[in-house]
């Protein structure tokens, strides 16, 4: 691990000031469950690490009439133990699938959303795109856990976030803050500029190693996640987990469905760990509307969700896994899963 400056601000404005320095070559420390591993491996080499755990405004869960506001520093254990969490079953499904108590005790929701890929080429110093002499190491190498969708460009890794699929299915938004400078009569004022962005637009597929995996620019910070009020929406996440090895799913699917009179009125299906970004199954989601959700209908939705998959040389098994995950997430959301297992 290389040396770096350490800073612990107490306000958003202080954090943004510290993040903007060193040309933006800084890193945010919240739970630290992923960052510390990256630092030890020299995968990231920030000049300064900014610890945001001491900023009071970034912690806690607040109920509003039209939704729930979750602070970036809220741990997974705190979310799991909150009375409101039961209304967002798909998020709790993810927490229940995490084997490491260290991750649930220290890891944060915002930290998960900002995770960098677990691709072994990237984690061993080959860059996000894992290119060597103009050729993809992934395409010709061990690609068992890589993308089966959205992999037509140079990016073959899969999005590492476990909470993005269910949060996107809920139409979540994130609050992003940036340092704002203005001058009046020769006096400079430094403030905080905020933006609310639908989470589905937060993730990007990079075309170069320098682009990153989210829209966050150097000096920007996620402060909160917003989830709309659940109303009559039912949700679930189904993860295909490994018995051993990484505490990461091979594939996941999250579903939010609104049912009235036994008929699906709204639906959104999001796949995880199958593409460089969380993958919204638009066609399958639209097709579900107007259907009575049965095991056969759920299976067809799963088939539609992966119809355009382009597996690599060693990961075609993930197509069937993703199809099954969609089916089971839908049935789990409507309390039918036990009938088909």
Name the predicted role of every residue range:
Residues 1-341:
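C-terminal structural segment of proteins
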């Amino acid at each position: 691990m290389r040396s770096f400056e350490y800073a612990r601000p107490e306000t958003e404005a202080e954090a943004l000031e510290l993040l903007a320095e060193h040309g933006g070559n800084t890193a945010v420390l919240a739970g630290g469950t992923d960052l510390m591993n990256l630092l030890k491996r020299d995968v990231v080499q920030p000049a300064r690490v900014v610890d945001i755990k001491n900023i009071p405004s970034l912690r806690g869960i607040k109920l509003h009439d039209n939704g729930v506001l979750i602070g970036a520093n809220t741990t997974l254990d705190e979310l799991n133990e909150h009375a409101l969490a039961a209304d967002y079953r798909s998020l709790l499904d993810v927490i229940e699938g995490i084997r490491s108590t260290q991750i649930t005790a220290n890891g944060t929701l915002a930290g998960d959303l900002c995770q960098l890929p677990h691709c072994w080429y990237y984690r061993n110093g080959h860059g996000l795109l894992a290119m060597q002499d103009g050729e993809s190491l992934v395409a010709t190498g061990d690609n068992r856990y890589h993308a089966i969708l959205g992999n037509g460009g140079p990016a073959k890794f899969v999005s590492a976030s476990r909470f993005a699929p269910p949060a996107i299915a809920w139409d979540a938004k994130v609050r992003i803050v940036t340092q704002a400078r203005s001058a009046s009569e020769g006096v400079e004022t430094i403030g905080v500029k905020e933006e609310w962005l639908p989470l589905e637009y937060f993730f990007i597929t990079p075309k170069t190693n320098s682009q990153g995996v989210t829209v966050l620019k150097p000096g920007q910070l996620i402060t909160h996640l917003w989830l709309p009020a659940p109303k009559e929406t039912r949700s679930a996440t189904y993860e295909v987990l490994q018995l051993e090895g990484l505490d990461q799913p091979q594939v996941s699917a999250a579903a939010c469905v609104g049912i009235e009179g036994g008929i699906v009125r709204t639906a959104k299906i999001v796949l995880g760990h199958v593409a460089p970004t969380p993958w919204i199954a638009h066609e399958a989601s639209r097709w579900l509307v107007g259907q009575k959700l049965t095991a056969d209908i759920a299976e067809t939705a799963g088939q539609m969700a992966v119809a355009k998959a382009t597996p690599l040389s060693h990961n075609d098994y993930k197509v069937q896994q993703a199809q099954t995950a969609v089916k089971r997430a839908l049935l789990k959301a409507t309390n039918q899963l036990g009938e088909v297992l």
